[in-house]
Each structure stands twice: as C-alpha cells, then as structure tokens.
From Swiss-Prot:
Name this protein carries in UniProt: Large subunit GTPase 1 homolog
Keyword Cytoplasm (UniProt): yes
Region (Disordered): 1-21, 574-606
GO molecular function, one term: GTP binding
Residues with PTM Phosphoserine: S276, S279
Organism: Drosophila melanogaster (Fruit fly)
Domain of life: Eukaryota
Entry EC no(s): 3.6.1.-
Residues given in the record as GTP binding sites: 213-216, 344-351, 388-391
Domain notes: In contrast to other GTP-binding proteins, this family is characterized by a circular permutation of the GTPase motifs described by a G4-G1-G3 pattern.
Biased composition (Basic residues): 584-600
Residue span(s) of domain CP-type G: 165-395
One of the record's GO cellular component terms: cytoplasm
Amino acid sequence: MGKKNKGGAPNLGRQLIKDRFGHTQRRKVDNDTMLHTTELQDGYDWGRLNLSSVTEESSFQAFLRTAELAGTEFQAEKLNITFVNPKQRVGLLSKTQEQRMHQKHDEHRDQLKIPRRPKWTKETSAEELVRAENEAFLDWRRDLALLQEDEEILMTPYEKNLEFWRQLWRVVERSDVVVQIVDARNPLLFRSADLERYVKEVEPSKMNMILVNKSDLLTEEQRRHWAEYFDSEGIRTAFYSATLVEEELKREAEECLDSFPEVQQLRRAVEEIKQSLDSVEDALNVIEQKYKTIPETQNDELPRLPGDKNSPRLLSRLELIEFLRNIYTGPRHTEQHVTVGMVGYPNVGKSSTINSLMTVKKVSVSATPGKTKRFQTLFLDKDILLCDCPGLVMPSFVLTKADMLLNGILPIDQMRDHVPAVNLLCERIPRHVLEDKYGIVIAKPLEGEDMERPPHSEELLLAYGYNRGFMTSNGQPDQARSARYVLKDYVNGRLLYAMSPPSVPQTEYHTFPERQRRVIEESQLPGQQQRAMRINKSTSKELDNQFFSDKPTHAHVKGRTNFPNVRLANDGSLVAGNDPAAKPWRHVKKERREKLRKKFSHLDEH
C-alpha cells in the first residue's frame, strides 16, 4: 500500500461534510441562500410540483373553480349551534308529521313518474332521436326536482344516467311480460306503478307481473294478505325465494356427490327416459296433426288462465318456470318463445333470482346500482327468454333517510349519522326481541319516564357494543361500529319486520314472539357493565348515595412506610399492621411497589 499523499487534492467527501456539519466560528454565506429574504408569493409559481392540466371536473369542482375565478370567498358561519340529544327520537317524525307526509304522498303520487321514450318513426334520424330523448329526460328531472323543492317531499335517490333508462326502454319494448321483482318485507316501496302504466302505453297487449322475492321471510297468512291486495289491484303476483332455492340446489348437489356409486344407475335411467320421450313425441305429433284439422275459434279478448287469482303459496324453481311459461297467451314479440323482462331495484335479489332459475351463475350479483351495464338475454328454456335489465333505482316516496337505510337503498357502510336509523329500528323491533336476539340487557327507562317506551339508539348500542367487545380507545363501547352490525342484521332479515298492505292494520299483520329468556335486572350485572350502559346517565338514588356517602380525607402514600407496625389499606389510609412481637421482615418484599392506576382505579371509572 502506497504512502498517503498529504499534498494531493482535497477529499471531496470530507469537504462536503465539513461544510455541512463543521462547527466553525465564521461560515461563508453564499449568494444563493435564503438568508435575509422573504417569500412574498406575489407572483405565479410556475415551478411548483402540483401543477396539473384539468380537462374534466365534477360539478362541485366546477362550481368552486368558477367562484374562485369570480373572486368569491366562502367563510364558515359557526352560529346557531343545535345540540342533538341522543336520548330522544332524533331524526324521526312525530305522528302528526307522518300523517301530513302520507297525505302529501297520496296527493302527488300521480306525479311520481319514470322518463318516457319519445315517439319515433322510421324517418326519424339518430341525431333527432337522441336530442328528443335528452330533452324529455331533462324535463323529467326538472319536474321531480320542483316536486321535491315545492312540496318538501323526500324521495329515494333515483337513477340520473340516461343510458340506464335507455336500457329499460329497450327491455320493455322487446318483452312480452315485464316482471317487477320486489322485496317481500316492503313490496310497495319497490313497486313502480308508473312503470306498469308505461308498459301498457308501449303495447296494450303486454303484461305486468310482480315477483315477491324473499317470501320465505313471510308467513302463509302474510302472503295471503298480499295476494288479496294485488288481486284488488288487478296484477298477477307470484311468491318466490331465491336464497331458499339456492340452498336446496346446494343440498341436492351434495346428495348427488354422496351417492356417487349410483351414477351408472342414473345414466341407465336417463337412457330409458330418453327412449320413452321419443315415443311420447311421436304420439304428440299424431295428436297435433289431428288438432290442425279442427277449425280455430276467433276471440278478441285475451284468454285468461284458469287460476287467475293470486296464490299465496311459495313457488319452487320448477313451479315458477312453469308459471312464466303459461302466464302469457297474447301475441309475442318473437313467435318461438315468450320474452320475460326482469326489472328491479338493486339489493332486492334480481340477479340472485335469475341465477337460481338458471341453476348456474349467469349474472353477477352486487348491491351497487350499475353493476349490469347492458341488458342481457338468457334462454331459461327453449320457449322462455329472460331479458335482464340493469338494476334501476326508480323514484319513490319515503319519510326519512332512516327509511332508505333500513330498506337497503342507501349503503350502510357510507352512512354519516347512525342515530336516526337505529332509533327507527328500535321503534319497529320491541325491546325483548332485541334482548333475546343478541343476549343483552338494555338499560331500562329512568324514573319519571314512560316505562313502555322503546329504547333509544344509545341504550341499544351501548349494551350491544359492550357485549361484543366493540370498545373505543378511551374504554367506552363503540356505538358507530355497533350500529353498522345491527343495521346490517335488519337489512339481511335477521331482525325481521314486514310492512303490511294498506288494507290490513300493521299491528295485526306483523306480530312478534313472546320473550324467550328470563328477565335479568341491571343490578345483577357486573359493575363495569352497569357503568358502560349508563354513560352520562344517573338516577336520583345514585345522586343521593354519591352526595351523602362518607368521603374520608387522607394523604396518598406511595411505596413502603418507615413504620413496621403500620400498613396501607386499600383506600390509601394507614391502619395497624401485624403483631409487634411477630417478625416484621417475614412475608414482606422490601422493594414492592403497587401501581397507582390499580390503587386508584375507582377514580378512572366511567
């Protein structure tokens, strides 16, 4: 190794380190430093990194950009603060307000329409048709906006993309039977009477039908009430459960796998059936030839099925297919098969219904509107063609946003305020049903309150959150997280509540079971659970006990004392220790220190 050259060029790295970290008395000030300068930001900074080209922006961003260009400033006004008490019926309407809103709904129900496709002929060009559709769609949106603004009526968020309505128009035009799939727990909310009128406007011979999905959640008596109601409305109805059919198909598939050695016998049976079908087909051909010789009878009216009255029976998959095959006897759009259009809200089970009928997954299932971009045609059988329309949220009247959350129209994971929805749930589901379902004890009303009132959202969520272990960082039950679980149980049918038809009182239509568990008093619960259930609440008895209780004053001593015959009690006071004649050093750890948070844990109780 050569000798180190001391007179060579200086080391660049060492010079940089000295310049950066050197502790010299005098430091050279370069001309390009920021010393004694001020950044005024009085010009446009073209060299900033967040400069980006804007070619497309949302309506809100466009509004803010226009206001910024106009020199408009926005300031938050922190006046008129409203205190929301979670121990009241927050976000719900009173009985008088509900009656007034129902009257408004009945008065303006005829104005609740869906957009119509403008009339067109073969001479109409594509540009003229698109222009007419856009104008009609804008007029429809303007009418609904004026209805909401003038009458202060709350409506469900409806589809605002014209392309989705174009898909509905095409489905209606090519369908012989238009089936509206509704939720059995609230069929009238998901039924669009104006869609039925539009179907008849397109072609009077077309037929409307309602398929009540999730009907396994209803009893036979409840289905009978709805069948009678739709009979009075003059519309055919069928009751079906896609989830029940899917479970049966899975069970049958498992049974087939279990009986795998019998596959050969099944194949022989299939061959025998094929041979018998061939002989039956030959006989049918002979009968058909004889039938053609009989003169046809003319009848202007459409023939009706022998069983025109709606049946409350829950149909199976094969029964529903046979029902769809025989329900329509008018002129068909395509002579070879009957076309059945499937229309429905998202989250009512439209895709699940189609998949259960096809016995394989043909349509993607999603609770989000817009999953299906274009209508699809699927052959259910050689003479039945299903036409699946994209999921459409049609305009409908509701009382509050809590209604939309409980009916699955608004996503629960995106809700901002859980209190109104949980309050509405507590009004619909009795206290003892909630306690039996979740195995919890909900706090009883305080003195002076109505003992029969439904629980508030805070009372239910505190008990549920503590029971499930959903706690916040400060040791209190997490109410927002508990609310999402409880609301999803309601939407999924685990907490069952079904709305009655207008002709039947709600109290007679839906009844709840009696209490299944024994009544547990709050005094039997652990102290920590009692305090968690009574956050910011105290009874007069608790106030009296706290005010008149003995509160001895004493000094808090930390660590060991220098008096061998004196020891610390649990409350921090000094008491007599062991016998003076005994050996004080026995069974005593000299350096023992008790944690203060354990000694004074009663001060941290919430």
